[in-house]
Amino acid sequence: MNKDSTQTWGLKRDITPCFGARLVQEGHRLHFLADRAGFTGSFSEVQTLQLDEAFPHFVAHLELMLLSCELNPRYAHCVTLYRNGLTGEADTLGSHGYVYIAILNRHGFNRHLRVI
């Protein structure tokens, strides 16, 4: 799958392939808007299937992190999640209503490890 976007909606990362999105926060719920998401680089068919499977789990876990206040809309704080060989990073960037994400096909971030 090759979808290079001119607009980067998620967290900006220098690694490709990368899927980025700006999720809309409503209380402790997150909403995905397809027009606020995009790809940088190309994911293989296998990687695309991994992303399709992992994405709902990433979002559900981020919602739990909002509920526990580990992810706070008022303060920038990057969290890292791992699933299906993918690394997901998320941060509100203190935006009061958005959660920015980047999902990469790699391991090795040493921040807040959460295998979900």
Curated annotation (Swiss-Prot):
It comes from Escherichia coli (strain K12). One of its GO terms (biological process) is positive regulation of cytoskeleton organization. Gene3D superfamilies: PAS domain. SUPFAM superfamilies: YeeU-like. Pfam families: CbeA_antitoxin (PF06154). Keywords: Toxin-antitoxin system. Putative antitoxin component of a type IV toxin-antitoxin (TA) system; its cognate toxin is unknown. This is Orphan antitoxin YagB. Encoded by the CP4-6 prophage. An insertion element (ISX') seems to have deleted the end of yagB, fusing it to 13 insX' codons to make a 116 fusion pseudogene that may be expressed. The cognate toxin appears to have been deleted at the same time. Belongs to the CbeA/YafW/YfjZ antitoxin family. The lineage of its organism: Bacteria, Pseudomonadati, Pseudomonadota, Gammaproteobacteria, Enterobacterales. It comes from the Bacteria.
